[in-house]
Amino acid sequence: SGPQGGSTWLDYHPYVFDRRADALRRHPFEPTLVDLGGGRKAEVLFSRVRVPMPTSVALDDFLLATHIGGYTGEASTIRDYTSMLRFDDGAGWSEPVPCSVNAPVEHDGWWFFQAQWDPPDQARFEGDRASRGLNYTVLGVANREGVMIQLFGCILSVVGMAYAFYVKPIIKRRKREAAQALAAQVRAGGQRASTALMVAVACAVLACAVPARADEAAKPFHEAVDLLPLGEVAVQTEGRLKSFGSFANTQMSFVSGPRRINGQSPEFTYLDLLLRPEAYEDADIVFVKGAAARVPIAEAVIDSSKGDDARKAAEERMAGFLKHGLISPALLQRPEVMATLRQMEQDLIRTEKVVSQIQGAMSVREPKYLLSRLLVIPPATDDPQQRWHSLGEVMMLAVDAERAKAAGIDQKPLPGIDIALQRAVASAWKDLVDAWAAQDAAAASKAVAALAASVHAVNPAVYPDTARLGWESWYFRNGNLTRVWLVYMAAIILLLLGLVYRWPRALAWGLAVFGIAFLLQTAAVMLRWWISQRWPNSNMFEAVTTASWFGACCAAGLELWLRRRPVRGWFALTASACSMVALMAAHFLPVQLNPNISNMMPVLHDVWLYIHTNVIIFSYALIFMAAISAGGYLLYRWRGGPATYARAGGTAAIVMAGGTGSAAAGGAGGAVVSAGGGAMGFGDDAQSAGGKGGLGELLDGVTLLLMELSFILLWAGIVMGAIWADHSWGRPWGWDPKEVFALNTFIVFALLIHVRWRVKDKGLWTAVLAVIGAAVMLFNWIVINFVITGLHSYA
């Protein structure tokens, strides 16, 4: 605080430096200047506590392991990095010891692990210098004291939860009901769903919006030209070999964001920007995210328009810009708009990132950039580290030799590749350029097919599987199959009709449509697994869609197991709601949930990715599903339902019930009510299914069952994350924001467990806390991932 009692926020610095010259790039040395009054000032630096190292460490070398194509200056091409360390033991320096990601080094009781490295960084501000990276490495240091005891305690608690939820209630229940007869089996009342309806729903969702075939001449050029052969063309980019369709989708997302320009496919727009750039100079193609950036840009465009007519036209155009976020490069290059962008660039919190994205879009749309990125010609050797070649490196070979010599054009061919094959590629590209300029769809389609065949022929031995490339293009062309949310919505409607109005046929149809949606979502997950060559859980799009698929898997298993119980249909309903919301988010929020396939960060190349991450996101799906049934219970109580609840231990009842439908709980009376609690059994009579109090018991039982499963999975996932963190970073817990809020979610459900034992209105409090727990979980996934910076976040 200053002399007048004011306050000043201090910026947090993760690394401590004594002077500006020692500061790491991307971690500037910026102490806060505080006015103490009387002309006195002081510099205050808020940072970590600095302690002396236990031993001297020297960085002997820094090694990079890369993906396909080697290191290109892009962080995405890095697969792993290794520091070669030497330690001073007093008697001299040791031999170099490798310290890699997920492979820490122990020395004298201390663990050293890779925390950061110096990635490439572009100059974004005036006076800043661009860096190719590789200037330093950052090592973490930990002592791991008591780690094994902590982890043993965590594992023991997981085992204890499983015993408390599953084993103990079963033992108590069987003792109480040893003398009771098994309940009668429910008559199989499901009616076979209409095959025609199911097929129609599936076809309606998966069908692309393909117009009816008409005379080719009547179609616009972007619809008439056949770009399907390019779907089997590989492009080397960011350390991967992508299909051209996937590649174009990624590149165009940098320009137009989630929007499609004039209804064109990303493949067509990429080629059209490359071959006809003049057509887009004043076209609205650059996407600007958020009202905070759009409003000042729109005001600058309107203010720069001279004359009443021009101003009115600008106002109308900017009204559309504020709605859809697309603006033309010509408008962005107006001096008044550029001045506004420079001002916005200074606002590091609200608009600097958006300005950086606009600058990136303006660069990506340039024909020179687009041509240089078309690395479609495989190298002459089988070495995966070799860079592929762009069409720009061979296209001049299509020019007549005499004319090229007269014009001074260099026709130097690529070394090691048959000149005839290179000329075939160049000739096909020239034919495509000429046909595109003439807007001749038939000739362009023929040239596209020739180009695809010619690049395949250059080196078939290193070319990826064309079937996989084709399916990858198909996957992106069909919106990543996120339209399956429509099928889940249809399932929800039918299931609600069947469950609320006790309409057996609607319930059967709803379960059938849920089965179709589940199969379609399974196909989407498996297809992405195949085309990406890794399990899809390493970015937000994959985490959200795969988590909902896990929830649907669980629901499908429970529905099969309990198909003759009154609870039939409720798990399918909650899973349908979960998957519908997840796929809707993926479909309508492609900026936040980027569907493009990229390489994983180096730290994710570990078996724990497939254990810890899958368990955590599975628990999140079950938490959301529990919130759906809890919301149903709250609605039931709001509509005047009695304060009924399922007797404790809902999941144990599933273990006891089996799949035959024989009642393990309560005989003809439905759910067992006992003074001492015990496992809740889903009874077989109509009263349990929908009579007075029965609906509340079912909803509470479903919530309790899903909550118990998610409770154990969440805690197990947190423990597994601690094991992975200790394995990778030398410490099991670092108070990272996402770690903290995952723990907060667990605490809410731990509170739920204990509150349920003490309160009288168990069903109400269970539902309220289940909804609160889901809110904390969603806060963890949304705010922590996209707003707050941390090891697990995308901020």
Describe the role of every protein-language-model region.
Residues S1-P3, I597-M600:
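Secretory/export targeting leaders with adjacent low-complexity proregions
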Residues S1-R144, V210-W474:
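Soluble non-transmembrane domains of integral membrane proteins
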Residues P54, D80-T82, N102, H107, ...:
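Active-site lining segments that contact anionic ligands and/or coordinate catalytic metals
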Residues Q150-V167, P229-E232, E238-S243, F247-N249, ...:
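Hydrophobic cores of alpha-helical transmembrane segments in multi-pass integral membrane proteins
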Residues K175-A202, G640-V702:
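Membrane-interfacial, low-structure loops and terminal tails that flank and connect transmembrane helices
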Residues R187-R213, S579, L583-M584, M777-N780:
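Internal/C-terminal transmembrane anchor helices
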Residues F476-N478:
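Fungal N-terminal intrinsically disordered, low-complexity regulatory regions
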